[in-house]
């Protein structure tokens, strides 16, 4: 039983009773409608889940939406049936971050305006909280229009493209584009007439399109052969996007009567403007193909020409054209041959064959074939490529045989050449006098001539001399249309060898001797020569790409660096190379605080060449130019007179850094099994505990290995010169300068830094300290415009207190057998440590040293690993460096340290950090007190009586010398970017001395230096004998006075063959 309909129906009620509601994405929501009649729902999508019931006279309808998405956003309408007279609505929002705008079920029709009409742009959002603006794409301006999230933008809009932009949670989202067109006509009208095919066969369909652009209110008129017979229905299609209208005429089952002119006239009704276009259609009753050759039956081409052969083809439809040579199809895959088919007209074509640089083998029969289905036609011609004659071979087959002498001349060419023979009996004039050559008498009984073709299609002419007297010259001539060539051969009668044979043998021996000498000279030149890697920059080109280096031999050398040979005792060899060696020694009288000091002495081997001696002297001069610094191996003195050159430098207790890291690797790994603990130790230091922390960075370390200098106390030493009988040498002691008297006066914190605490072992803080100290040392070298060129862990030494010393150890290293050095020309280079500009452009600067510093960091934090592990220096390695390959982070480096490496490895040198910046960056990774402690140690070093410091002070205080300033020095200082005043305080007063007095003679010098001796020390070095090892009483005080004498001699300059 159905309820009775009331006379007045009220609007149904929707629950929940809201105008709009927001539901979650992918959720389920229900809407319930109650009314007095049957109910129906309408929504943004088809609703298939709807239940209806009747309770207490009320109709109830419920819709359920599962998995709500953006498409469910919209207005839901509940209507009373059957009249739909009343209805209620609710608007549902389903916010979807991925779909900010509601997808439209029907596409937006491009709106066309004749003026500014009010219209609606239906960009509705799924999130009601979104802020939406309308953007005009042409001007990128925001349009002042009101927005309704349930409808979109409504207002007056001009022609253009619009986009709705929604701002949701700080991000912009753009809708699809909405295009609004303005009406135009008259002057913009353009008409085009197109045909799918202009030539057809009987029975095909003719299709002609008349396209009108730029106007919309148009009228079309057609003229064509079948119009009177009412053939050809017309269709109209409008493309509103591009304002184009297509009028299409179609004529089916075409016949030859439909051939003719087809014309289309379009008239703009608004402006009455008209345009007419026409074209010609041809209908054939059968297919056809014909070839009209433009070449003859025989064609010629010269060698290396680019001949072109053409044929005209009349065909309908388009033909398939094939070219053949000697019945073989010529394909497009052959680079020397190209074939093309050009369309000249509707039924006119041209076939073209091109030979790229014609060759002899291109001669042959050519055919062009044109096909249309079962119809085909062809044309053939012969091509001859003309080749100049050539004599392939001319040999004396039976030289001096009993059967006579036979000469064979093999000749080729196209066309085949004719072969003739000439003979010359006066050998002295055959080369210069052509009249001496006469045609060979082939009718003679003593001569036989035969002609034949060989397997290579060459002409062979055989001439046999049955009886030959003396020596004659025979000439073979080959000639054809392209020219003539000839070759000669000398024939000798059988008998003793002529003088020519003897001369040839002597010539061969002479050539062998010359080649041997050249090989020996090349081998001698390729033998590597010793050269100091350090360079001092004199000037820089304006573009910064060319550097001029100071010639070290032009630097002055002050004799106050001289140290008496009899004050120096040599010991064991610390390192030996191809050119020289470094020997441990003890110096007496270098310093007041240390009458006896352990030192390292550089010297050449007895077999050294003059170039090596000059290089060692250059190294000495550069070291005197640099001055002292805590983190370089400082010069203490030199011996350059009355014997070989010795350079006396600081003694480094632990040897080089590579082997020190190898030696302590196991202990380091045992303490750092957990990387997190290591990072905490580096960066998680509690400032409150900092004062009580032991700075092991400068503490005494465990036993070294390579060049281990700690074993010196057990060795027996060799005195350089024999002293008088009363003189005694004391045993060589461990150098006390590593802890000079001035250092012992530090406060407790400094003493903690210099304590000999070997229990701590190698720590991560040590690795950072080494990194910082090397940066400070290189910062100092850069301030002196000095380029190292071989910065690597093997050239970094470690002294007591873990103080890093930068050096150049090339003299005492066998680089020819060291895998770290690669042969390039006559030298060996550390390629894996070199910057790209140094490898490829031979450019060395402070910035190329920065690259090497990055490689050194990798060595330190890999605990002495070899850079680019597993990679061989070859072309592949160089290509990887060019393409930007860089090493991965070493195991024990933090991300900050690795970032520093990558900055050093920037492919653009000017973008690499300076050493000043590098030292500041590394200092920020260390405890705050470390840098203060380092500066205090450095300050006390510069205020101590270290020989390197005191000798420089003597030179600085001497008014008899003036400084040398180099060109562009200010520019190079600027490139080093900010060397602060405090850091330069150690060397700001140091200048390169120039002599203004005549150098003293050796005689005068020997009078001043009462410790000098004329005894040669070569025998002492070579025999290894040792004098007494006890120093006589009172001699130390006399030796100390040497320092005072050095400071008093202001004019002593050393000058010999190497200065």
Curated annotation (Swiss-Prot):
It is found in: Cell membrane; Cell projection, Cilium; Golgi apparatus. ATP binds at residues 574-582, 602. The chain crosses the membrane at residues 504-524. Present in an inactive conformation in the absence of bound ligand. Binding of pdgfa and/or pdgfb leads to dimerization and activation by autophosphorylation on tyrosine residues. The keyword Kinase applies. Residues 32-91, 103-180, 189-282, 293-380, 389-477 form the Ig-like C2-type domain. Disulfide bonds join 33-78, 123-164, 210-264, 409-476. Belongs to the protein kinase superfamily. Tyr protein kinase family. CSF-1/PDGF receptor subfamily. Tyrosine-protein kinase that acts as a cell-surface receptor for pdgfa, pdgfb and pdgfc and plays an essential role in the regulation of embryonic development, cell proliferation, survival and chemotaxis. Depending on the context, promotes or inhibits cell proliferation and cell migration. Plays an important role in the differentiation of bone marrow-derived mesenchymal stem cells. Required for normal skeleton development. Required for normal development of the gastrointestinal tract. Plays a role in cell migration and chemotaxis in wound healing. Interacts with homodimeric pdgfa, pdgfb and pdgfc, and with heterodimers formed by pdgfa and pdgfb. Monomer in the absence of bound ligand. Interaction with dimeric pdgfa, pdgfb and/or pdgfc leads to receptor dimerization, where both pdgfra homodimers and heterodimers with pdgfrb are observed. This is Platelet-derived growth factor receptor alpha. It comes from Danio rerio. The gene is pdgfra.
């Amino acid at each position: 039983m159905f309820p009775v309909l009331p006379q007045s129906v009220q609007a149904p009620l929707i629950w929940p009773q809201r105008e709009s509601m927001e539901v979650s994405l992918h959720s389920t929501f229900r809407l319930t409608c109650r009314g007095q009649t049957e109910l129906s729902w309408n929504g943004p999508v088809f609703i298939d889940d709807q239940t209806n019931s009747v309770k207490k006279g009320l109709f109830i309808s419920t819709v359920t939406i599962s998995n709500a998405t953006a498409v469910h956003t919209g207005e839901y309408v509940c209507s009373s049936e059957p009249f739909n007279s009343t209805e209620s609505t609710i608007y549902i929002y389903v916010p979807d971050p991925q779909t900010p705008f509601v997808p439209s079920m029907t596409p937006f029709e491009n709106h066309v305006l004749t003026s500014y009409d009010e219209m609606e742009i239906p960009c509705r959002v799924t999130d009601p909280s979104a802020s939406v603006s309308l953007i005009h794409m042409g001007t990128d301006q925001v349009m002042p229009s009101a927005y309704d999230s349930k409808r979109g933008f409504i207002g007056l809009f001009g022609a253009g493209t619009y986009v709705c932009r929604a701002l949701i949670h700080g991000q912009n989202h753009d809708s699809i584009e909405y295009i609004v067109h303005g009406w135009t006509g008259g002057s913009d009208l353009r008409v085009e007439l197109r045909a799918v095919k202009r030539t057809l066969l009987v029975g095909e369909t003719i299709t002609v399109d008349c396209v009108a652009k730029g106007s919309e209110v148009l009228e079309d008129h057609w003229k064509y052969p079948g119009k009177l017979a009412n053939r050809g229905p017309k269709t109209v299609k409008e493309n509103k996007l591009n304002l184009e209208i297509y009028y299409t005429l179609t004529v089916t089952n075409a016949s030859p009567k439909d051939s003719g002119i087809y014309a289309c006239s379009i008239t703009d009704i608004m402006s009455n403007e008209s345009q007419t276009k026409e074209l010609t259609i041809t209908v054939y009753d059968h297919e056809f193909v014909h070839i009209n050759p433009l070449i003859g039956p025989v064609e010629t081409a010269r060698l290396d020409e680019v001949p072109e052969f053409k044929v005209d083809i009349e065909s309908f439809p388009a033909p398939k054209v094939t070219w053949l040579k000697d019945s073989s199809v010529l394909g497009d895959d052959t680079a020397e041959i190209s074939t093309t088919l050009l369309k000249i007209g509707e039924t006119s074509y041209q076939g073209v064959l091109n030979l790229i640089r014609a060759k002899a083998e291109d001669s042959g029969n050519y055919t062009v074939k044109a096909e249309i289905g079962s119809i085909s036609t062809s044309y053939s011609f012969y091509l001859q490529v003309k080749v100049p004659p050539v004599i392939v071979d001319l040999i004396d087959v039976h030289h001096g045989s009993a059967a006579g002498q036979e000469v064979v001349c093999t000749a080729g060419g196209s066309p085949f050449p004719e072969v003739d023979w000439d003979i010359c009996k006066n050998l002295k004039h055959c080369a210069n006098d052509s009249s001496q050559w006469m045609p060979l008498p082939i009718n003679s009984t003593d001569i036989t001539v035969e002609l034949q073709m060989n397997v290579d299609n060459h002409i062979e002419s055989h001439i046999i001399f049955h009886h030959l007297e003396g020596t004659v010259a025979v000439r073979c001539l080959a000639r054809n249309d392209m020219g003539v060539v000839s070759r000669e051969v000398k024939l000798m009668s059988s008998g003793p060898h002529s003088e020519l044979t003897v001369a040839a043998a002597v010539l061969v021996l002479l050539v062998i001797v010359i080649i041997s000498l050249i090989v020996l000279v090349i081998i001698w030149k390729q033998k590597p020569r010793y050269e100091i890697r350090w360079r001092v920059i004199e000037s820089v080109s304006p573009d910064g790409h060319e550097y001029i280096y100071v010639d070290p031999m032009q630097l002055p050398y002050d004799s106050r660096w001289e140290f008496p040979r009899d004050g120096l005792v040599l010991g064991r060899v610390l390192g030996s190379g191809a050119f020289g060696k470094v020997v441990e020694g003890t110096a007496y009288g270098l310093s007041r605080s240390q009458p006896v000091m352990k030192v390292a002495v550089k010297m050449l081997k007895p077999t050294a060449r003059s170039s090596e001696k000059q290089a060692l002297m250059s190294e000495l001069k550069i070291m005197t130019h640099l001055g002292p610094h805590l983190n370089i191996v400082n010069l203490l003195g030199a011996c350059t007179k009355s014997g070989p050159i010795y350079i006396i430098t600081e003694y480094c207790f632990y040897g080089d850094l590579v082997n020190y890291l190898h030696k302590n690797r196991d202990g380091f790994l045992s303490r750092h099994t957990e990387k997190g603990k290591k990072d905490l130790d580096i960066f998680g230091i509690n400032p409150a505990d900092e004062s009580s922390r032991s700075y092991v960075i400068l503490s005494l370390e465990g036993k070294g290995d390579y060049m281990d200098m700690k074993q010196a106390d057990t060795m027996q030493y060799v005195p350089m010169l024999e002293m008088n009988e009363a003189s005694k040498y004391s045993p060589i002691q461990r150098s006390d300068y590593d802890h000079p008297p001035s250092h012992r006066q530090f406060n407790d914190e400094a003493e903690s830094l210099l304590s000999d605490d070997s229990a701590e072992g190698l720590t991560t803080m040590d690795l950072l300290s080494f990194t910082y100290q090397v940066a400070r040392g290189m910062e100092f070298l850069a301030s002196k415009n000095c380029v190292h060129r071989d910065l690597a862990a093997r050239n970094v030494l470690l002294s007591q207190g873990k103080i890093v010393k930068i050096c150049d150890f090339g003299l005492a290293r066998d680089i020819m057998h060291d895998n770290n050095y690669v042969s390039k020309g006559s030298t060996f280079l550390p390629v894996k440590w070199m910057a790209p500009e140094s490898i490829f452009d031979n450019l060395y600067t402070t910035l190329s040293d920065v690259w090497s510093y990055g490689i050194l960091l990798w060595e330190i934090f890999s605990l002495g690993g070899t850079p680019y592990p597993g990679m061989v220096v070859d072309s592949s390695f160089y290509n990887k460096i060019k393409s930007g390959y860089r090493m991965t982070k070493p195991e024990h480096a933090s991300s900050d340290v690795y970032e520093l490496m990558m900055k050093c490895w920037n492919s653009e040198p000017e973008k690499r950090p300076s050493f000043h910046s590098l030292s500041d960056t590394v200092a920020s990774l260390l405890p705050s007190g470390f840098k203060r402690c380092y500066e205090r140690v450095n300050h006390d070093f510069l205020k101590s009586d270290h020989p390197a410091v005191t000798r420089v002070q003597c030179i600085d205080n001497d008014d008899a010398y003036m400084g040398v300033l180099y060109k562009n020095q200010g520019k190079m200082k600027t490139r080093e970017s900010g060397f602060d005043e405090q850091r330069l305080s150690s060397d700001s007063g140091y200048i390169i001395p120039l002599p203004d007095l005549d150098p003293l003679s050796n005689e005068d010098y020997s009078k001043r230096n009462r410790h000098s001796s004329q005894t040669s020390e070569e025998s002492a070095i070579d025999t290894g004998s040792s004098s007494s090892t006890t120093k006589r009483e009172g001699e130390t005080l006399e030796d100390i006075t040497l320092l005072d004498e050095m400071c008093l001699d202001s004019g002593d300059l050393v000058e010999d063959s190497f200065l």
